[in-house]
């Protein structure tokens, strides 16, 4: 997903891309791609987990990047951004709609806001077994909320189906991608391997 996002940004955005704010930087997969393709002058990285800053010691040490740990929905971010980007994080937000409005105030006049998120079918098998999951917005709902503040340059939905041989492989995938959408409930092999009848 990060590669696709990076390619799309590379197609639409001018280079170098001045100031970039990345929401939900995680381990830095998209960050590294942005550095290679858009060559930002300044990069502000955000993740809810302070521990993720250790993935960026080279960038933070050079002064090219700063790291702000905390909840992106309430954390104060610097204004004057050329690009605000988020890959696979907005589905965790209580109100993406309010965040869209806020991002508009952080962007320069000709700035861009780009994000990926998950659709309604994301992890539906896990949700059916656990009885828990996130509220995913449809593409139409997202577009409606965005049109209030932005001119939409590109919006599309893509279905990516992953298959796994065992429930354990599912757990490993969820752990390594950080997209396990089960609220306040431990996800265990017992939950996943229960037969559904």
Regions flagged by a language model, labelled:
Residues 1-16:
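Conserved alpha-helix/loop element of class I SAM-dependent methyltransferases that forms part
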Residues 19-75:
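Class I SAM-dependent methyltransferase SAM/SAH-binding core
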Residues 73-84:
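A short acidic, Gly/Pro-enriched loop at the edge of an enzyme's catalytic core
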Residues 83-96:
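A short SAM/SAH-binding and catalytic strip from SAM-dependent methyltransferases
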Residues 97-112:
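A short glycine-rich, Lys/Arg-flanked "PGG" loop and its adjoining helix->strand segment in the class I
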Residues 108-169, 177-188:
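Conserved catalytic/acceptor-binding region of the Class I
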Residues 190-196:
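Residue-level detector of conserved catalytic or cofactor/ligand-binding positions
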């Amino acid at each position: 997903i990060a590669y696709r996002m990076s390619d799309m940004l590379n197609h639409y955005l001018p280079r170098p891309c001045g100031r970039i704010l990345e929401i939900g930087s995680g381990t830095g997969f998209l960050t590294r791609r942005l550095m290679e393709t858009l060559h930002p002058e300044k990069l502000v990285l955000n993740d809810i987990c302070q521990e993720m800053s250790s993935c960026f010691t080279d960038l933070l040490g050079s002064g090219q990047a700063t790291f702000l740990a905390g909840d992106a929905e309430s954390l104060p971010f610097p204004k004057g951004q050329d690009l605000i980007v988020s890959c696979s994080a907005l589905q965790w937000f209580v109100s993406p709609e309010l965040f869209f409005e806020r991002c508009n105030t952080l962007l320069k006049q000709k700035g861009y806001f780009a994000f990926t998120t998950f659709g309604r079918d994301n992890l539906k098998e896990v949700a059916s077994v656990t009885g828990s999951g996130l509220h995913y917005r449809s593409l139409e709902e997202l577009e409606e909320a965005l049109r209030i503040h932005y001119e939409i340059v590109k919006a599309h939905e893509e279905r990516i189906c992953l298959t796994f041989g065992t429930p354990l492989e599912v757990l490993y995938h969820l752990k390594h991608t950080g997209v396990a959408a089960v609220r306040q409930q431990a996800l265990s092999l017992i939950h996943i391997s229960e037969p559904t009848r």
